[in-house]
Structure formats: C-alpha cells, structure tokens
Curated annotation (Swiss-Prot):
An annotated GO BP: DNA replication
Protein name according to UniProt: Protein P
Activity regulation information from UniProt: Activated by host HSP70 and HSP40 in vitro to be able to bind the epsilon loop of the pgRNA. Because deletion of the RNase H region renders the protein partly chaperone-independent, the chaperones may be needed indirectly to relieve occlusion of the RNA-binding site by this domain. Inhibited by several reverse-transcriptase inhibitors: Lamivudine, Adefovir and Entecavir.
Chain positions recorded as Mg(2+) binding sites: D470, D590, D591
Gene it is expressed from: P
Length: 884
C-alpha cells in the first residue's frame, strides 16, 4: 500500500484526478512528487510551516518536557549500594591467555597491551577545590547524599578500584599489586619494600640532617634559630654576590655544614667523613629536596584517632628519646610515617594543626565536639559523646606505592543516581570528568567500530541458539597506570566543609573552626545524623573526614573508557572464536553474545568460557545471563533468522508518546528534539524511514516551535504501527544499472535496455534517485549499480520531502554498488544514445559489517575433538560455521 494514499485523499486541495496521478505509475508520479509547488501545497495542508513568533510556546506535554521545565532529580534515601567483588585481572594476563587459547595475533596483543595497563595523560588538566568533590544535586537531601556518596567511594576503595592519597607522593590501596605497581612499591602488608629500605639507607645522612633540624627547632638550649640559619645563608650569599668568590654550590655546601654543626650531641661532621666539601655536596645535595620533604611530611603524616591525644604525646616523647639516643648511628633513619610529635615551638605546632595531608584541618571535628560543651539540645556533641570509640580518622590499605605529585585538589565531582530507568532501588556513581570533553582541556578520543542496524542484521541474523553474558562492573576490570592518578581525582570535603559558612575556615589564620563548627548544630542536621548513624554506625566518623582518591581502575566518566573496554572485549571474543570455530561469539562493550547450533553445545561452551574467565579474573554477572533460544534480544532489538525488529517496549513507548502530543499547539524545539530522538530508534523499521521526520528536523535546526496537525499526527501513528524487519544482505553480483541526466533516465540489465525522458528538467541528484527507483520497481533487483554518491549514501533527507518518503518506501531493502560513469552501461541510454555492445562490469556486493568481524584471521589452532561430547555436534566432524 502506498504510504501517502490515505494522506493524499484527506487533503482537500488535491483533486481526485491529481491524487490518482500521484498514486499512479512511478515514471509519472515520481517527477511530480519532486515538484516544489506540490510540496508547498501539502505542507500548507498539514500545517508543516514554522509558526510565527507571537504565539506562546508549549514547554511541557504529558510525557515529554521541553525548555524551562527541567525535571528535578529524585533522591532515594533507601538506595542499595552495589557490592563489588575482588576485581583483579591475572598479573600475567597475556601469558595466561596464550596457555588457554594458543598464540595470540598481533591485533589481539595490541588491544590487550592498550588495556594492561591503560594510560591517560591529557595535555592539560584543571584542578578544582575539594569543596566541589560531591555535587549537591539533591538540595532537600544534601546531608544524606553527602554521606551516601562518601560511603560509595570508600566501598570502591575497599574493592581495590580507587587509590587513597596519603600525601602528594604516596598512594595506598587494598588488594594485590600489579607488576607495574611493584616498581613503585613502598609498603606491602605492613612491611617496607626492599627497594624502599635500600633507598632510605642510602639517604640516611639526609634524613639524619632533617632530624637534627627537627631537634634544633624543639630544643631551647640551642641559641641559633632557623631565622638565623636563613640569615647566615643569605648573608653569605650577598657577600658572595658582591665579591664574586662564592658560587651557588658553595652556598648549598655551607647550608649542609650548618645543619651538621647544630646537631645536639651528634658526632657526624664533614671532617670525619674523610672527604672534601665538594665531594660531600655531590653525595648529599642530590637528596636535599628529599630531606626537606621528609622533614615536612614527618610533621604532617600522622593518622590520629579521636580519642588518642594522650597516647600520641607519650609515643612522641618515647620516640624523641629514641631519636636522640640513636642520632650517632650512621645507618639509622627515622621512619617517614609516624604520629604527630608534641613540638615545643608554638609556631611549629600552629602550622602542624592547621592542615593535614589532604589540605584540610587536622583537628578532628568529632574530637572537637567531644571536648566542647553542647551548644543546645540539637548539638552534635550529644551524638559524638554517645560512643567512647569512633574508630580511626582514616585508614591505610594493604599496599603503599609512590606516585607522581598529586595535588590537594580534584579533577571531577561525583554524585549518585538511579542504576537505570527501570531500577530505582540501587544507586550508581556518576563521575563528572567533562572537562576532558570541552574547552582547552578537551581530549580527542579515539574512534572504534560500532555496529549499526544493518551490521547486526548481517552478523547475527541466523537460525542459532543464543546466550547473552554480562561482565560485572566491566570498566572496573581494566587497570590504569599510577602515573594517570593526578588526572583522575575525586574526593570528599568532609563534614566540616559541608556547611557553606565553614568553607572559609581553612583560610582563616586564626583557625576559627572550633568557633564556627556549632553552625552545623541544627535540628535538621541533628536528626539526619541520628538516622545516618543507624545506617553506618561507627563508620559515620570515617565518612565525615575529608579525603582524596584517584582511580586505579577505568572510570566511566572519561571518553577513553568505552574505547578501551571495546578493545578488551573484542580481543576476548576473537580468541574464543578461534578456539570454537563452530560457534558465533560477538562482543560489544560489556555484552557478550554466544551462538551455537544446538542448546547442548551452547551449554558446553558457556561452562568452559565461565571457568576460563573466572581463572583470568573476569567476573560474569550470573543473574544477567539469559538464554534466548532462536530470538536474540540484543541492544534493544529482537534478532531472528528473518531479520531485526525493535523490542515491544520501545514500540509501546513510541505509541504512548505520539498519542500524548497535543494538536494545533506550538511545541518548543526541545520537545521536538526529545521526541525525534525517541522516534529515530524505530524509524528504520517504518516504510518512509527518517524522511518522515524531516519537518521536525527543520524546526529543530531553526530552533523554533512546531505545530502538529491532526493529519500529520495520524499519518505518523499509522507509519509506526506497521513495522518491517531489517533483513540480512546477501553477497550477490550486480546485474542492473541505472543512470540519469537532468532530462532523461536509463536502465541496463543483462537482457534489456530501458530509457525515458522527464516532463521538465530536474536536479541531477533527484534524477538519479528517480532512475534508481524505476530500476527497483521494474526489475525487482535488490542490488543496483549507480555512479551518484548521494544515492549511494542512502541518506534521502536532502531531497524534496514527498519524493524522499516514497523513494525510501520503494528502495527499502535495496543495496547499491558504485560503478564509474565510463563503465556504467546505462550512461548512454540515459542520454538517448545507443550503448556500446560490451559485457556488464562484474561487481559483487560485500555485506556491510562496519569493520566488525565474526572470525579471526590467525595462526591455525590444533584441532581438538573432545570424547565426552556424545551428541551430534560440529566438533566431531570439524565443520566450521561460515559467517555471511
């Protein structure tokens, strides 16, 4: 049935004779449909012209929202956070894969090396303050969302997915270290690594000098202060500048000599080392920055608990005695991570209590409330004092490694949303790394093959038994190099910065946090903390502290992640295909599809793949494993041997949305955008395709309103109620060729020549399209040869609207192949000339696969015939499945 038959008969401006002519033979009707006058008359009848600006736009329909009507995100206080298994790929993944699947191809090795480890080094990175770590997307549930997001981040850290920043050069995490992390290892399971101990022994002189400076600051008997030290050095530098007798290296040597002289009871001097000051400078000055860093980090690297102030002072006194007694030993060096010492200098103490490793006040908010009097009936003091032991302020992982300089900042904010539109009971973490997709920090992501609708039909439209697998937390399987951590930082500002009035307390030199912390004591915060304590218990104290974390596994908010995941899963699918040539294995992102000729054979393959993947460290989500039979549900489509159709839920959704569209009201372009995005998904299955939505496209590009008429709305409903499958392309030889000129057309086949003229001149692209439609109508060929690139592309939205809709209906399921004009046998008949007698060019269609293959050209694998397979199976006779 003609797609415009009912529509043309309902248009009063078209007479009966004109309607019969438009619905008549294609050689007469198609040139008329390309006429500009007819398209304007139909557009006026359907009210498809853009409305005037004085009309008031509609910004919301029953199901779709437009401009100025953003839907507020819904927060679920009872969100269930997912539990992540121990996601750790095998350390020798490539060697392990070769044991299972034989020698790998070059492409498979290249894809695996891209992911093991993944590398992300943008040219520029913007850093944001920690106050922007958790986005306030739910103003009515700000505190609940704050603690839920912090708990989600700590859950990821406990699963080994995140690094925890200890200081600017040290990271800690839980789990097993990878081989590239072994090179940066500092501590593993509470024991110092050998390489780290060796480097500390080599720099014992530098660390000892840093300890001497520490003792010098805390000793009252030493008359020389650090200010005098800097003045002496500056005086020497000024004198050397005036006289020109002292160089910069001599200034550094004098500084080291002065550090050695101010030692309390130390016997290490330059003269006793048996070397000249120049030699001493060469051995020590290279580590002078490390010495300064060791001194600074030793002041700020302590991890305290809210109740351990007395024990810390006792430990620090005993530790100071140990340092003074061992100061004469050459091999001794103080540890880098120790508890805060009780410095006698008030200036040093004030600097130490201001900032911790993450750049936040080290004064624990929990301890502050515990030590102060309650300010009222809703003071947080009542909650804090209910427990004697709230646990540590922070934790340390099993492994500590060195890292590049990691600032006290973040590169992206985080927030929680529903796991998917159909599951609002579970939460999902969203990481906003959008800075790498815009502005001067934009990164051009690599492209990879994505299967379109025709590719899926060509690859998977077969009569096989199907099974779909889902990789659990697929992105978090792929590790990232520790050098990329400074670019992928997330964190929490802590409860002390939760209130906006406390945001400036870290910049206040008087450290007025204790004076302003009671601004948190409100009835809402108090009641929310009581409910949160019922949920998290003692962990509430840990979640209230600030922290900075970096991704150890691949995050989902970076454009590089889909590319790397696609490479990883496609390499796995290629290896499985080589070892099971009798089955179909297809992977797209985290979805893996298996196909076999019998269900028993499919079960055997599934059990083997599950055991292999589990041994490699790849976790499959058993709950999402689905057996489809002969009807595969994949990427929202139903794929069978007869073709591809959309799932019923998408068809019902489109029908509901179209029926809810109001008639004769100007809808803003944002509503048109969202409605067109929904209709586009099913448009390839309709008779007119994307061309039916051209009036909506015109309104969107013009950024103006669009008015749905009752005729246009009913016509769209009739189109989307009748869907046709997208069938698989066949590899056939082209035997029909078409060509056209502005005044005529020509068709050549193996046994006849056809030609004709147009009643009026047409654009060359329009004439070529009409010639292709005539060739399809008169010969029924599903493969046509043409020399016009516009027709070859298959995109008909640039033609007149009526012609584009009818041409899409006629050419549905038709493929094209390019033939040069000099070799096109229909070229001369289109010009009204007799053709040259010569054989037709032999052109064969290759079905479109979008650079996606279902087989792997690789070294041959030795055939294996399992004896345990007793049923009739292709494995016994080694009959391979040949893809289309």
């Amino acid at each position: 049935m003609h797609p415009f038959s009912r529509l043309f008969r309902n248009i009063q401006s078209l007479g009966e004779e004109e309607v019969q002519e438009l619905l008549g033979p294609p050689e007469d009707a198609l040139p008329l449909l390309a006429g500009e006058d007819l398209n304007h008359r139909v557009a006026d009848a359907l009210n498809l012209h853009l409305p005037t600006a004085d009309l008031q736009w509609v910004h919301k329909t029953n199901a779709i929202t437009g401009l100025y009507s953003n839907q507020a995100a819904q927060f679920n206080p009872h969100w269930i956070q997912p539990e992540f298994p121990e996601l750790h790929l095998h350390n020798d993944l490539i060697q392990k894969l070769q044991q299972y699947f034989g020698p790998l191809t070059i492409n498979e090795k290249r894809k695996l090396q891209l992911n093991f480890p993944a590398r992300f080094f943008p040219k520029a990175t913007k850093y944001f303050p920690l106050i922007k770590g958790i986005k306030n997307n739910y103003p009515n549930f700000a505190l609940e969302h704050f603690f839920a997001t912090a708990n989600y981040l700590w859950t990821l850290w406990e699963a080994g997915i995140l690094y925890l920043r200890k200081n600017q050069t040290t990271l800690t995490f839980k789990g097993k270290p990878y081989s590239w992390e072994h090179r940066q290892l500092v501590q593993h399971n509470g024991q110092q690594h050998k390489s780290h101990l060796q480097s500390r022994q080599n720099s014992s002189m530098v660390a000892c000098s840093g300890h001497l400076l520490h003792n010098h600051l805390s000793s009252e008997s030493v008359s020389v202060s650090t200010r005098n030290l800097s003045n002496n050095i500056s005086d020497k530098s000024q004198k050397s500048t005036r006289t020109g007798l002292c160089s910069y290296k001599q200034i550094q040597t004098d500084r080291l000599e002065h550090l050695a002289r101010i030692s309390c009871g130390s016997k290490i001097t330059i003269g006793q080392q048996g070397s000249s000051p120049k030699t001493l400078y060469k051995s020590i000055s290279s580590n002078f920055r490390n010495q300064t860093w060791a001194y600074n980090s030793s002041r700020n690297s302590g991890h305290t608990t809210w109740f351990s102030s007395a024990s810390n002072s006792n430990k620090s006194r005993s530790r100071e005695k140990a340092y003074s007694s061992n100061s004469t030993s050459k091999r001794y060096s103080p540890p880098l991570n120790y508890e805060k010492s009780d410095f006698s200098s008030p200036g040093v103490r004030r600097r130490i209590t201001r900032l911790d490793n993450n750049g936040t006040p080290t004064q624990c908010l929990w301890r502050s409330f515990y030590n102060t009097k309650p300010c009222g009936s809703y003071c947080i003091h009542h909650i804090v004092s209910s427990l004697d032991d709230w646990g540590p302020c922070t934790v340390t992982g099993d492994v500590t490694i060195k890292s590049p300089r990691t600032p006290r900042r973040i590169t992206g904010g985080v927030f929680l949303v529903d796991k998917n539109p159909n599951n609002s009971s579970e939460s999902r973490l969203v990481v906003d790394f959008s800075q790498f997709s815009r502005g001067h920090t934009r990164v051009h992501w690599p492209k990879f093959a994505v299967p379109n609708l025709q590719t899926l039909a060509n690859l998977l439209s077969t009569n096989l038994q199907w099974l779909s697998l889902d990789v659990s937390a697929a992105f978090y399987h792929i590790p990232i190099s520790p050098a990329a951590v400074p670019h992928l930082l997330v964190g929490s500002p802590g409860l002390e910065r939760f209130n906006t009035c406390l945001s400036s307390s870290t910049h206040n030199r008087n450290n007025s946090q204790l004076q302003t912390m009671h601004n948190l004591c409100t009835r809402h915060v108090y009641s929310s903390l009581l409910l949160l304590f019922k949920t998290y218990g003692r962990k509430l104290h840990l979640l209230a502290h600030p922290f900075i974390m970096g991704f150890r596994k691949l995050p989902m908010g970076v454009g590089l992640s889909p590319f790397l995941l696609a490479q990883f899963t496609s390499a796995l699918a290629s290896m499985v295909r080589r070892n099971f040539p009798h089955c179909v294995v297809f992977a797209y992102m985290d979805d893996l599809v298996l196909g076999a000729r019998t269900s028993e054979h499919l079960t055997a393959i599934y059990s083997h793949i599950c055991s292999v993947f589990l041994d490699l460290g790849i976790h499959l989500n058993v709950n999402k494993t689905k057996w489809w039979g002969n009807h595969l549900h994949f990427m929202g489509y139903v794929i069978t041997s007869s073709g591809v159709l959309p799932q019923d839920k998408h068809v019902k959704k489109i029908s509901r949305y179209l029926r809810s569209v109001p008639v004769n009201q100007p809808l803003d372009y944002k509503i048109c955008e969202r409605l067109t995005g929904i209709l586009n998904y099913v448009a390839p299955f309709t008779l007119c395709g994307y061309a039916a939505l051209m009036p909506l496209y015109h309104a969107i590009t013009s950024r103006t309103a669009f008015i749905f008429s009752s005729l246009y709305k009913s016509w769209l409903l009739s189109l989307y109620e009748e869907l046709w499958p997208v069938v698989r392309q066949r590899g056939v030889v082209c035997t029909v060729f078409a060509d056209a000129t502005p005044t005529g057309w020509g068709i050549a086949t193996t046994y006849q020549l056809l030609s004709g003229t147009f009643a009026f001149p047409l654009p060359i692209a329009t004439a070529e399209l009409i010639a292709a439609c005539l060739a399809r109508c008169w010969t029924g060929a599903r493969l046509l040869g043409t020399d016009n690139s516009v027709v070859l592309s298959g995109k008909l939205t640039s033609f007149p609207w009526l012609l584009a809709c009818v041409a899409n209906w006629i050419l549905r399921g038709t493929s094209f192949c390019y033939v040069p004009s000099a070799l096109n046998p229909a070229d001369l008949p289109s010009r009204g000339l007799l053709p040259v007698l010569r054989p037709l060019p032999r052109l064969r269609l290759r079905p479109q696969t979008s650079r996606i293959s279902l087989w792997a050209a690789s070294p041959p694998v030795s055939p294996r015939r399992p004896v345990r397979v007793a049923w009739s199976s292709p494995v016994q006779n080694c009959e391979p499945w040949i893809p289309p």
